[in-house]
Amino acid sequence: YIILSGDQLYHMDLAEFLKKHQESGADITIACTAVNRADASGFGILKADKTNKITEFMEKPGSTKDISEWIIPDETRTPGAVKGKDYLASMGIYIFNANVMEECLNNTLTDFGKEIIPEGIKKYAVNAYVYDGYWEDIGTIRSFYDATLDLTGITPKFNFYDEDAPIYTHNRNLPSSKVNMATLDQVTTSEGCVITNATIKRSVIGIRSIIESGSYLEGVICMGADCYETDSEKADNATKKIPNIGIGERCVIRRSIIDKNARIGKDVSIGMGKIPEDGDYGWYHVVDGIYVITKNACVPDGTVI
């Protein structure tokens, strides 16, 4: 069994991972990567000998605990364990032999990091597979935001255009995006977008996004829309006095994640003033200074937050 995490971004050859597991004769193999002290506080950290056998495991030691004894020894350091990245952290990616997995789950234990792995080390042969490539945990709003916007860089850390590690997605059968009289700098766009006379910087524009004339976006992740609105639906919106799906005219939006199907009216300003405290404000949230516009949100004309 290969156990993967759903909130991480990384390039890994799983076939190579499986091959190393089989060659080692281990019952369980844990994918690991070198991290700094600050990151180590939130991950399971471990000790491994010269043969990559794991001898000890500690789940999320926190920021105040003395873990100096867990620093990676020089003789077992890999190229990814550069100065400052002194601790070996579990990536939350595992391979279990089938019989071992069944035995580990035939009890009341439920949490891999806190229960199953520490108990498994006591009973089974558990090895580390040290991964030196790109890996980012995107389980928080801040980490998701930073990792996503990093993709807009000229040479991003995670490269979608690597011929040796291609990324595939399903075919949506949509037209290519249309950009009319707009200025885009360090921007990635998905299929089916229509961008008109807007200025967009360092942003990711999702599928079927509609961005109207005069708008300015910077540091924005726009998730897009599930469908296009018809002319009759837009007429109905006008009758109900609600914006169409997308971003209206003359909006200024910074430091934001806009979830799918959001309706942002004309002359809306988000992220230009003083950042409010983190919290739930109805149709939007603030997390680590990042504005999160909720799915299907309706933002009236002239709104300023």
Describe every region a protein language model picked out.
Residues H11-Y94:
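Conserved core of the sugar-phosphate nucleotidyltransferase
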Residues E75-G84, A98-I305:
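Left-handed beta-helix
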